[in-house]
Amino acid sequence: MRFVLFFLIALPQFAADRQVAITIDDLPRGGDAINRCSSDLLGFTQRFLRPLRKAGVPFSGFVNEGQCREQLGDAKLAAILRQWKDAGAELGNHTAQHPNYNDTPRDQFFAGILEGERVTKQVTGAPVRYFRHPYLHTGKTLEDKRALEQWLRAHGYIIAPITIDTPDYIYAALYAHAKDDAEARRIRADYLRIMEELFAFYEQRSREVLGREIAQTVLIHASQLNADCLPSLIAMMKRRGYRIVSLTEALKDPLYAVDETFVADQGISWIHRWGASKGMPIQWEPDPPKWVNEAYKMMVR
Protein backbone atom coordinates (compact mmCIF):
# COMPACT_ATOMS: atom_id res chain seq x y z
CA MET A 1 0.00 0.00 0.00
CA ARG A 2 2.82 2.42 0.85
CA PHE A 3 4.32 1.69 -2.57
CA VAL A 4 1.12 2.63 -4.36
CA LEU A 5 0.51 5.74 -2.26
CA PHE A 6 4.05 6.94 -2.88
CA PHE A 7 3.70 6.79 -6.62
CA LEU A 8 0.24 8.27 -6.67
CA ILE A 9 1.57 11.19 -4.62
CA ALA A 10 4.68 11.50 -6.79
CA LEU A 11 2.67 11.32 -10.00
CA PRO A 12 2.66 15.01 -11.07
CA GLN A 13 6.47 15.14 -11.20
CA PHE A 14 6.58 12.68 -14.08
CA ALA A 15 3.24 13.13 -15.79
CA ALA A 16 4.13 15.76 -18.40
CA ASP A 17 5.69 13.62 -21.15
CA ARG A 18 4.19 10.19 -20.55
CA GLN A 19 3.20 8.08 -23.54
CA VAL A 20 1.68 4.62 -23.74
CA ALA A 21 0.71 2.32 -26.59
CA ILE A 22 -2.20 -0.06 -26.00
CA THR A 23 -1.47 -3.49 -27.48
CA ILE A 24 -4.04 -6.28 -27.45
CA ASP A 25 -3.10 -9.94 -27.87
CA ASP A 26 -4.84 -13.10 -29.04
CA LEU A 27 -7.26 -11.61 -31.54
CA PRO A 28 -10.00 -12.25 -32.41
CA ARG A 29 -10.58 -13.22 -28.77
CA GLY A 30 -8.43 -14.58 -25.99
CA GLY A 31 -7.38 -14.44 -22.40
CA ASP A 32 -10.61 -15.53 -20.75
CA ALA A 33 -10.50 -19.32 -21.12
CA ILE A 34 -13.65 -19.65 -23.20
CA ASN A 35 -14.35 -20.61 -26.81
CA ARG A 36 -12.36 -18.08 -28.84
CA CYS A 37 -14.43 -18.63 -31.97
CA SER A 38 -17.97 -18.71 -30.59
CA SER A 39 -21.07 -17.80 -32.56
CA ASP A 40 -21.15 -14.47 -30.69
CA LEU A 41 -17.68 -13.46 -31.87
CA LEU A 42 -19.05 -10.71 -34.10
CA GLY A 43 -21.08 -9.23 -31.24
CA PHE A 44 -18.16 -9.55 -28.84
CA THR A 45 -15.88 -7.73 -31.26
CA GLN A 46 -18.34 -4.86 -31.57
CA ARG A 47 -18.60 -4.61 -27.77
CA PHE A 48 -14.84 -4.72 -27.31
CA LEU A 49 -14.14 -2.04 -29.90
CA ARG A 50 -16.88 0.35 -28.76
CA PRO A 51 -14.90 2.04 -25.93
CA LEU A 52 -11.80 2.30 -28.11
CA ARG A 53 -13.80 3.96 -30.88
CA LYS A 54 -15.46 6.29 -28.40
CA ALA A 55 -12.13 7.32 -26.86
CA GLY A 56 -10.60 7.83 -30.30
CA VAL A 57 -7.27 6.34 -29.24
CA PRO A 58 -4.82 4.36 -31.38
CA PHE A 59 -4.20 0.71 -30.55
CA SER A 60 -2.67 -2.46 -31.97
CA GLY A 61 -4.04 -5.99 -32.10
CA PHE A 62 -2.03 -9.18 -32.49
CA VAL A 63 -3.79 -11.99 -34.31
CA ASN A 64 -3.76 -15.77 -33.87
CA GLU A 65 -5.45 -16.80 -37.10
CA GLY A 66 -5.22 -20.57 -36.83
CA GLN A 67 -8.04 -21.79 -34.59
CA CYS A 68 -10.70 -19.38 -35.80
CA ARG A 69 -9.69 -19.79 -39.42
CA GLU A 70 -10.21 -23.52 -39.04
CA GLN A 71 -13.57 -23.15 -37.27
CA LEU A 72 -15.00 -20.13 -39.10
CA GLY A 73 -13.26 -20.13 -42.46
CA ASP A 74 -11.22 -17.37 -44.06
CA ALA A 75 -14.17 -15.18 -45.02
CA LYS A 76 -15.72 -14.99 -41.54
CA LEU A 77 -12.37 -14.41 -39.87
CA ALA A 78 -11.62 -11.67 -42.39
CA ALA A 79 -14.94 -10.00 -41.56
CA ILE A 80 -14.03 -9.98 -37.87
CA LEU A 81 -10.54 -8.63 -38.47
CA ARG A 82 -11.94 -5.99 -40.80
CA GLN A 83 -13.91 -4.63 -37.84
CA TRP A 84 -10.65 -4.19 -35.98
CA LYS A 85 -9.00 -2.52 -38.95
CA ASP A 86 -11.98 -0.20 -39.51
CA ALA A 87 -11.83 0.80 -35.83
CA GLY A 88 -8.25 1.95 -36.38
CA ALA A 89 -6.24 -1.04 -35.18
CA GLU A 90 -2.77 -1.79 -36.45
CA LEU A 91 -3.00 -5.56 -36.94
CA GLY A 92 0.09 -7.60 -36.09
CA ASN A 93 1.12 -11.26 -36.21
CA HIS A 94 1.00 -13.40 -33.07
CA THR A 95 1.53 -16.66 -35.06
CA ALA A 96 -1.21 -18.96 -36.32
CA GLN A 97 -1.48 -21.29 -33.31
CA HIS A 98 0.32 -19.46 -30.45
CA PRO A 99 3.16 -22.00 -29.99
CA ASN A 100 5.93 -21.60 -27.44
CA TYR A 101 9.13 -20.75 -29.31
CA ASN A 102 11.19 -22.15 -26.45
CA ASP A 103 10.04 -25.70 -27.14
CA THR A 104 9.12 -25.57 -30.85
CA PRO A 105 11.60 -26.44 -33.64
CA ARG A 106 12.72 -23.25 -35.37
CA ASP A 107 11.53 -24.15 -38.85
CA GLN A 108 8.12 -25.13 -37.51
CA PHE A 109 7.85 -21.89 -35.55
CA PHE A 110 8.88 -19.78 -38.54
CA ALA A 111 6.32 -21.57 -40.71
CA GLY A 112 3.67 -20.75 -38.10
CA ILE A 113 4.49 -17.06 -38.40
CA LEU A 114 3.96 -17.14 -42.16
CA GLU A 115 0.77 -19.14 -41.70
CA GLY A 116 -0.40 -16.56 -39.17
CA GLU A 117 -0.40 -13.64 -41.59
CA ARG A 118 -2.50 -15.03 -44.41
CA VAL A 119 -5.93 -13.55 -43.67
CA THR A 120 -4.52 -10.51 -41.91
CA LYS A 121 -2.65 -9.49 -45.08
CA GLN A 122 -5.85 -9.86 -47.09
CA VAL A 123 -7.66 -7.55 -44.67
CA THR A 124 -4.96 -4.88 -44.42
CA GLY A 125 -3.97 -5.00 -48.07
CA ALA A 126 -0.36 -4.55 -46.98
CA PRO A 127 2.47 -6.50 -45.37
CA VAL A 128 2.03 -7.14 -41.66
CA ARG A 129 4.64 -5.02 -39.86
CA TYR A 130 4.68 -6.14 -36.24
CA PHE A 131 5.30 -9.47 -34.53
CA ARG A 132 4.47 -10.31 -30.92
CA HIS A 133 6.07 -13.41 -29.36
CA PRO A 134 3.54 -15.90 -27.93
CA TYR A 135 3.95 -16.05 -24.14
CA LEU A 136 6.64 -13.34 -24.64
CA HIS A 137 9.10 -16.23 -25.02
CA THR A 138 12.04 -15.11 -27.16
CA GLY A 139 14.34 -18.14 -26.89
CA LYS A 140 16.05 -20.27 -24.25
CA THR A 141 19.51 -19.59 -25.69
CA LEU A 142 21.08 -16.51 -27.24
CA GLU A 143 21.53 -18.48 -30.46
CA ASP A 144 17.79 -19.21 -30.62
CA LYS A 145 16.97 -15.60 -29.80
CA ARG A 146 19.24 -14.18 -32.50
CA ALA A 147 18.00 -16.70 -35.06
CA LEU A 148 14.41 -15.55 -34.58
CA GLU A 149 15.39 -11.88 -34.65
CA GLN A 150 17.32 -12.42 -37.90
CA TRP A 151 14.42 -14.33 -39.49
CA LEU A 152 11.94 -11.61 -38.53
CA ARG A 153 14.16 -8.86 -39.98
CA ALA A 154 14.59 -10.83 -43.20
CA HIS A 155 10.80 -11.08 -43.52
CA GLY A 156 10.15 -7.41 -42.82
CA TYR A 157 8.89 -7.79 -39.26
CA ILE A 158 9.45 -5.46 -36.32
CA ILE A 159 9.33 -7.05 -32.86
CA ALA A 160 6.59 -5.54 -30.69
CA PRO A 161 8.01 -5.46 -27.16
CA ILE A 162 6.00 -4.78 -24.04
CA THR A 163 7.08 -2.83 -21.00
CA ILE A 164 3.95 -3.10 -18.84
CA ASP A 165 3.13 -6.78 -18.47
CA THR A 166 -0.17 -7.61 -16.81
CA PRO A 167 -2.00 -10.64 -15.37
CA ASP A 168 -5.21 -9.60 -17.10
CA TYR A 169 -5.77 -13.14 -18.42
CA ILE A 170 -6.08 -14.40 -14.82
CA TYR A 171 -8.75 -11.84 -13.96
CA ALA A 172 -10.42 -12.30 -17.36
CA ALA A 173 -10.82 -16.05 -16.88
CA LEU A 174 -12.36 -15.55 -13.43
CA TYR A 175 -14.60 -12.79 -14.76
CA ALA A 176 -15.90 -14.93 -17.60
CA HIS A 177 -16.95 -17.56 -15.06
CA ALA A 178 -18.18 -15.29 -12.25
CA LYS A 179 -21.19 -16.83 -10.52
CA ASP A 180 -23.07 -13.56 -10.06
CA ASP A 181 -22.87 -9.77 -10.49
CA ALA A 182 -21.33 -9.25 -7.06
CA GLU A 183 -18.43 -11.56 -7.85
CA ALA A 184 -17.96 -9.92 -11.25
CA ARG A 185 -17.83 -6.48 -9.62
CA ARG A 186 -15.24 -7.68 -7.10
CA ILE A 187 -13.04 -9.08 -9.87
CA ARG A 188 -13.38 -5.90 -11.93
CA ALA A 189 -12.50 -3.69 -8.98
CA ASP A 190 -9.36 -5.61 -8.09
CA TYR A 191 -8.30 -5.78 -11.73
CA LEU A 192 -8.48 -2.00 -12.04
CA ARG A 193 -6.60 -1.64 -8.76
CA ILE A 194 -3.71 -3.87 -9.80
CA MET A 195 -3.48 -2.30 -13.25
CA GLU A 196 -2.78 1.09 -11.72
CA GLU A 197 -0.33 -0.48 -9.29
CA LEU A 198 1.49 -2.07 -12.24
CA PHE A 199 1.69 1.25 -14.08
CA ALA A 200 3.25 2.80 -10.97
CA PHE A 201 5.69 -0.08 -10.63
CA TYR A 202 6.90 -0.03 -14.23
CA GLU A 203 7.18 3.76 -14.24
CA GLN A 204 9.56 3.55 -11.29
CA ARG A 205 11.42 0.51 -12.63
CA SER A 206 11.92 2.24 -15.98
CA ARG A 207 13.59 5.15 -14.23
CA GLU A 208 15.83 2.77 -12.27
CA VAL A 209 16.83 0.60 -15.25
CA LEU A 210 16.81 3.09 -18.13
CA GLY A 211 17.32 6.43 -16.42
CA ARG A 212 13.93 7.81 -17.37
CA GLU A 213 10.42 6.66 -18.20
CA ILE A 214 10.24 4.99 -21.57
CA ALA A 215 7.26 5.42 -23.89
CA GLN A 216 5.37 2.47 -22.42
CA THR A 217 3.70 -0.42 -24.24
CA VAL A 218 1.00 -2.19 -22.24
CA LEU A 219 -0.20 -5.73 -22.93
CA ILE A 220 -3.82 -6.75 -22.49
CA HIS A 221 -5.99 -9.38 -24.17
CA ALA A 222 -9.18 -9.33 -26.19
CA SER A 223 -11.46 -10.47 -23.36
CA GLN A 224 -14.88 -9.55 -22.01
CA LEU A 225 -13.20 -8.17 -18.89
CA ASN A 226 -11.28 -5.65 -20.94
CA ALA A 227 -14.34 -4.87 -23.05
CA ASP A 228 -16.03 -3.80 -19.80
CA CYS A 229 -12.97 -2.16 -18.21
CA LEU A 230 -11.43 -0.25 -21.13
CA PRO A 231 -13.23 3.03 -20.31
CA SER A 232 -11.83 2.91 -16.77
CA LEU A 233 -8.38 1.80 -17.95
CA ILE A 234 -8.17 4.62 -20.48
CA ALA A 235 -9.31 7.11 -17.83
CA MET A 236 -6.62 5.79 -15.46
CA MET A 237 -3.90 6.23 -18.08
CA LYS A 238 -4.99 9.78 -18.78
CA ARG A 239 -5.22 10.55 -15.07
CA ARG A 240 -1.61 9.43 -14.73
CA GLY A 241 -0.65 11.91 -17.42
CA TYR A 242 -0.39 9.56 -20.38
CA ARG A 243 -0.94 10.44 -23.99
CA ILE A 244 -2.11 7.26 -25.72
CA VAL A 245 -0.07 6.79 -28.89
CA SER A 246 0.31 4.22 -31.63
CA LEU A 247 2.82 1.42 -31.31
CA THR A 248 4.78 3.00 -34.15
CA GLU A 249 4.99 6.28 -32.23
CA ALA A 250 5.99 4.58 -28.96
CA LEU A 251 8.78 2.63 -30.65
CA LYS A 252 10.36 5.88 -31.83
CA ASP A 253 11.66 6.24 -28.29
CA PRO A 254 15.40 5.59 -28.72
CA LEU A 255 15.44 3.44 -25.58
CA TYR A 256 13.79 0.67 -27.61
CA ALA A 257 17.01 0.42 -29.64
CA VAL A 258 18.91 -0.73 -26.53
CA ASP A 259 19.95 -4.34 -27.06
CA GLU A 260 18.88 -7.00 -24.59
CA THR A 261 20.36 -10.46 -24.21
CA PHE A 262 17.92 -12.01 -21.73
CA VAL A 263 17.32 -15.72 -22.36
CA ALA A 264 15.28 -18.02 -20.15
CA ASP A 265 12.12 -20.08 -20.18
CA GLN A 266 10.18 -16.98 -19.11
CA GLY A 267 8.15 -14.29 -20.82
CA ILE A 268 8.77 -10.98 -19.10
CA SER A 269 8.66 -7.22 -19.59
CA TRP A 270 11.40 -5.68 -21.71
CA ILE A 271 12.22 -3.43 -18.76
CA HIS A 272 13.20 -6.57 -16.83
CA ARG A 273 15.15 -7.78 -19.88
CA TRP A 274 17.14 -4.57 -20.19
CA GLY A 275 17.89 -4.62 -16.49
CA ALA A 276 19.01 -8.26 -16.52
CA SER A 277 21.18 -7.55 -19.57
CA LYS A 278 22.94 -4.87 -17.51
CA GLY A 279 23.48 -7.32 -14.67
CA MET A 280 20.78 -5.81 -12.49
CA PRO A 281 18.68 -8.21 -10.39
CA ILE A 282 15.08 -8.46 -11.54
CA GLN A 283 12.64 -6.79 -9.19
CA TRP A 284 9.34 -8.51 -9.89
CA GLU A 285 6.09 -6.68 -10.41
CA PRO A 286 3.23 -6.94 -7.88
CA ASP A 287 1.22 -10.17 -7.98
CA PRO A 288 -2.56 -10.48 -7.81
CA PRO A 289 -3.83 -11.10 -4.28
CA LYS A 290 -4.03 -14.60 -2.87
CA TRP A 291 -7.79 -14.95 -3.43
CA VAL A 292 -7.36 -14.22 -7.15
CA ASN A 293 -4.45 -16.60 -7.67
CA GLU A 294 -6.10 -19.41 -5.71
CA ALA A 295 -9.39 -19.05 -7.57
CA TYR A 296 -7.55 -19.15 -10.89
CA LYS A 297 -5.58 -22.26 -9.92
CA MET A 298 -8.79 -24.00 -8.91
CA MET A 299 -10.39 -23.10 -12.22
CA VAL A 300 -7.61 -24.28 -14.53
CA ARG A 301 -6.38 -27.37 -12.67
Protein language model regions, located:
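Noncatalytic linker/hinge segments flanking ATPase motor cores
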Residues: G61-G66, N100-P105, F131-H137, Y171-Y175, ...
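Compositionally biased, intrinsically disordered low-complexity regions
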Residues: A10-A15, M298
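Short, basic, helix/turn surface patches
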Residues: K85-N93, V119-A126, E183-Y202, I268-P288, ...
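Sec-dependent N-terminal signal peptides
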Residues: R2-P12
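Catalytic domains of cell-wall/extracellular-matrix polysaccharide-remodeling enzymes
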Residues: R69-K76, Q97-R243, E249
